[in-house]
């Protein structure tokens, strides 16, 4: 039955999304838990993640001692400009952010629409890494930014990234700090704020939307693009000659990808 096939497909997509998102901590437990040393947010066209994080930090500034906004200009930066243009609030700064590195777009959003207290008033130190052009460089250059700021003893570090790339990004950060003695390495935890769920509706895949998180279908990927991202990501994670692991390009450590 075609409907059964779509229903099976939705289960497969959700399984894959859950694996790639690799959520180890969610925003609610982050809000309630002890402050962490560092939160890294990698810019993504899913702006809802930044919105929810900035809102949480506005209501509880000591959430993290350091906040790093991450992302230069890469192959999908234009999608972030498009997402800003479509956004009901942020669209007012579209002209100003067009052409900026991704991390600077996040900084504009943070400064214009949210108010965090300064470090002296208990707020986080905000750093910007705006030179990287891919996931591996995000990690290496973020470490440089932290080192230059004198932030070298990080115990707990939350990584917020596009849910389709969350597992790989965490692996990239672990790789970037692997030269440190085991006890001095940060403990990285993946915290994708938005993890899409799909279901079958009239023979089509559609997103299950979370009204509490203020998430709209247009905030997410077109479904075909979403599928392509998921499949491409699995290829990168596999530790073989085509992947990004030790047996391939060596950008990340070994990741077990279930068959």
Please tell me what each predicted stretch does.
Residues 1-211:
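A structural signal for short, hydrophobic/glycine-enriched beta-strand patches
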Residues 197-259:
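A conserved mid-domain beta-alpha-beta active-site/ligand-binding segment of alpha/beta enzyme cores
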